[in-house]
UniProtKB/Swiss-Prot annotation:
This is 3-dehydroquinate synthase. One of its GO terms (molecular function) is nucleotide binding. It holds the Pfam family DHQ_synthase. It comes from Sodalis glossinidius (strain morsitans). GO terms for biological process: amino acid biosynthetic process; aromatic amino acid family biosynthetic process; chorismate biosynthetic process.
């Protein structure tokens, strides 16, 4: 069992990583006998985990209700969020309740925002079931729902009480979702840890084969890297923005194409290559390292370019609504060298368009 702490003073919390954690109600700290909880999941995961987890928590003396939401990024909306509030109110949950987010990034973001909002804030536990949510979205307290004009535009910074990562969940993960998660894994190597990037080059096939030791190390290292960044910059005023490598381009793809048509990691992978091409045009990040990034993303089953039906100019309106835009100036996360990145302010529109075209060639 691995345990990492996200250090945020009195709001610090543990990340626990092991196989079989969902079989042990004690994993869901700080829930104790006599507590009430609302388990939030989706209709794809409910048949796999819902009944057994509710039964184990009930046997441990926790009063558990549940709400099952429709699966998919297109359902990360205010309308679906209201279903969580309705379930909480219908079952008379008060400020002493705990929400359990059992699912991938959509459920984690949505249930976390529900917890931040319900009665001005209740406790919640992240129980991520996808690789992407285990290595990224469950850690750090970003919660949100989407708007038709932009991804994650309505939300709050709100930290969980704990993160419970059961490695066994990955055994039921579709291959496309696994590849999507690997995009976020590779991101950490590009922006923060060149040695980890090299480890990924050596161990990618083991990860794709769901080799337990490789997965455990990979997830632990990603969580360590993100925990350090969040501890230093919780509200994304500086270093934390680096975690958005590829996301400004990627969110444009997700929004333009309709939520759910491109998985988040698929869009981020394309966005990372666009950021790499922009960095090359600005005279940073070597051709050799750009080729290493491209090769690793391809081995992970990820695309190097955006949708064929999306013109380069289509990206710009979406990118200008990005949360990193300040005073009408676009800010892009760009790699400098492998393991290092920067936030570049005022990247010209023609440079953005050229970087997208470079990935279409």
């Amino acid at each position: 069992m691995e345990r990492i702490t996200v250090t945020l003073g009195e709001r610090s919390y543990p990340i626990t990583i092991a196989a079989g954690l969902f079989n042990d109600p004690a994993s869901f700290w700080p829930l104790t006998r006599g507590d009430s909880a609302m388990l939030v999941t989706n209709d794809r995961l409910a048949p796999l985990y819902l009944e057994s987890l509710c039964e184990r928590l009930t046997q441990a003396g926790v009063k558990v209700d549940r709400v099952v939401l429709p699966d998919g990024e297109q359902n990360k909306s205010l309308t679906v969020l209201d279903q969580v509030f309705t379930a909480l109110l219908a079952k008379s949950h008060g400020r002493d309740t705990t929400l359990i987010a059992l699912g991938g990034g959509v459920i984690g973001d949505l249930a976390g925002f529900a917890a931040a909002s319900y009665q001005r804030g209740v406790r919640f536990i992240q129980a991520p079931t996808t690789l992407l949510s285990q290595v990224d979205s469950s850690v750090g307290g970003k919660t949100a729902v989407n708007h038709s004009l932009g991804k994650n535009m309505i939300g709050a910074f709100y930290q969980p009480a704990s993160v419970v990562i059961d490695l066994d969940c990955l055994n039921t993960l579709p291959r496309r979702e696994l590849s999507s998660g690997l995009a976020e894994v590779i991101k950490y190597g590009i922006i923060l840890d060149a040695a980890f990037f090299a480890w990924l080059e050596d161990n990618l096939e083991a990860l794709l084969a769901l080799e337990p030791q490789a997965l455990a190390y990979c997830i632990r290292r990603c969580c360590e890297l993100k925990a350090d960044v969040v501890a230093a910059d919780e509200r994304e005023q500086g270093q934390r923005a680096l975690l958005n490598l590829g996301h400004t381009y990627g969110h444009a793809i997700e929004t333009h194409m309709g939520y759910g048509n491109w998985l988040h990691g698929e869009a981020v992978a394309a966005g990372m290559m666009m950021a790499v091409r922009a960095a090359r045009r600005l005279g940073q990040f070597s051709d050799a390292d750009a080729e290493r990034v491209s090769a690793l993303l391809q081995r992970a089953g990820l695309t190097m370019s955006g949708p064929a039906e999306m013109a380069p100019e289509d990206y710009l309106p979406h990118m200008m609504r990005d949360k990193k835009v300040i005073a009408g100036r676009l800010r892009l996360v760009l790699p400098v060298t492998l393991g290092n990145a920067e936030v570049r302010t005022g990247v010209a529109d023609d440079m953005v368009v050229a970087s997208i075209k470079d990935c279409q060639a």
